[in-house]
Amino acid sequence: MKIKSMIMVVIMMLCITINAQEQSNKTLVAYFSATGTTEKAAKLIVEVTGGTLYEIQPKKEYVTADLDWHNKSSRSSVEMSNAKLRPTLKSKPENLADYDIIYIGFPIWWNSAPRIINTFIESDNFAGKVIIPFATSGGSSISNAEKELRETYPDMKWQKGQLLNGATKEDIKKWTKK
């Protein structure tokens, strides 16, 4: 009888543990990185949070000439000069509905998020999800990009974003615990 009781207790504890794991928040770390800088930050966030990494990719990859912000005819300059322009995505993440928390990372372009971030956000239903932006930049802060995203998508559950230039794993741990 004692053995049966012990087995029942073990089975119940196992069921409780499995149920708790299923109810925990699932995290997606989605990022766009034209040069690899934002990708490094995204990978650190995945290490710290245990989230799933997803690269936001344009259907047509950016080449160096596309990123020349001094050239008004470059692809990035043209995209950023038109707030309604939406570059096509190569793919969409599978099972977005399974995620509760979504980090969205990007380089700052013209003091804003690149237009492909708008494409990504508009490609699926983010209702009820916690959205946490992060960015990298050669000289701008994330504040204007974050403000624009909040204003453009007011129904999303935005959390405070973070600029992660040269961030370490410890920096990410401190930020994600806030």
Enumerate the language-model features and the residues they cover:
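Secondary-structure boundary/capping positions in well-ordered alpha/beta enzyme cores
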Residues: 52, 127, 156-159
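Active-site-proximal beta-strand/loop segments in catalytic clefts of secreted hydrolases
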Residues: 32-34, 56-59, 105-108, 134-137, ...
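Bacterial Sec-dependent N-terminal signal peptides
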Residues: 1-23
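N-terminal beta1-alpha1-beta2 submodule of the flavodoxin-like/Rossmannoid cofactor-binding fold
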Residues: 20-100, 111-113, 170-177
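Glycine-rich phosphate/pyrophosphate-binding loop and the adjoining helix
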Residues: 157-178
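Helix-loop-strand module that forms the ligand-binding subsite of alpha/beta enzymes
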Residues: 70-154
